[in-house]
Every structure is written in structure tokens, then in C-alpha cells.
């Protein structure tokens, strides 16, 4: 008899803006990437390789019909087990391997100046503000 690997739980949150946040629980094999987890949770569009814009990997261009544009864009965040808060991964979603129970959130940002994106986290609504974890070190 073959033994199967343990499954992991992934909570996928999608914040469309205007207080519209959706949550989907997934059970998956360890090693699934963040893009595949999103694809299981929503109807998505993405470009498989954005190396022309110096993003070496896939970029999400639409989730459930909410498309990127000049002032609209999707950013994803991760909240790993035993971590203090949400963080911005420094890689494209197809490169981020999820190996343990994790929360992944996608937020549809509408901004002309970027300040909102830098200050508020993935689940911010008019009634609840979530902040993102920051690193103050200079690189």
C-alpha cells in the first residue's frame, strides 16, 4: 500500500475593493504554488512570463473579471504559519511554493499615487484596517 503525503490547508482571500472580500479554503498537496492556489479559488487571467517588464514569472492580469489597468492592479500577500503578520512576497506567484498551512490574499488596488498600497494590507475594508509587516532595514 502506498502512503500519500499529508495535505495542507490554504486559505485564499480575494479583496475586490468596496468592502467585497471573498474567502475560499483549499486542501492541496505541499509544494503547490500561489498562482495554482488562486486558480483553484477563482477565475483568473495571467501572462505566463513577464520578463519583458523585468518580472521573471507569471503576472495576474484579472481575477473574476477585475482587470488590471493604469490605476488598477493586483498584489498578493502571504501570512505563513507562526509568522507575525502579512508580508509581500518578493517573487511572482508561480514561484512561491506553499509547503505548510498558509493564508494567501489578493487585493485589487485602485490608486493613482501608491500610498494606499504601501500602508494598508490585503483585507482592508471601510470597517477593518489590516496593516502589512514592514522591514525598516536599508538594503
Model regions and ranges:
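Ubiquitin-like/PB1-type beta-grasp interaction modules and other compact soluble beta-rich domains
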Residues: 1-139
Amino acid at each position: 500500500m502506498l502512503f500519500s503525503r499529508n495535505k495542507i490547508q490554504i486559505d485564499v482571500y480575494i479583496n475586490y475593493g468596496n468592502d467585497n472580500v471573498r474567502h475560499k479554503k483549499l486542501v492541496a498537496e505541499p509544494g503547490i504554488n500561489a498562482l495554482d492556489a488562486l486558480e483553484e479559488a477563482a477565475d483568473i487571467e495571467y501572462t505566463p512570463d513577464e520578463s519583458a517588464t523585468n518580472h521573471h514569472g507569471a503576472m495576474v492580469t484579472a481575477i473574476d473579471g477585475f482587470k488590471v489597468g493604469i490605476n488598477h492592479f493586483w498584489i498578493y500577500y502571504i501570512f505563513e504559519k507562526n509568522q507575525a503578520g502579512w508580508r509581500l512576497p518578493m517573487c511572482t506567484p508561480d514561484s512561491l511554493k506553499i509547503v505548510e498551512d498558509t493564508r494567501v490574499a489578493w487585493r485589487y488596488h485602485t490608486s493613482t499615487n501608491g500610498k494606499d498600497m504601501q500602508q494598508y494590507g490585503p483585507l482592508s475594508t471601510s470597517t477593518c484596517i489590516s496593516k502589512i509587516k514592514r522591514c525598516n532595514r536599508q538594503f
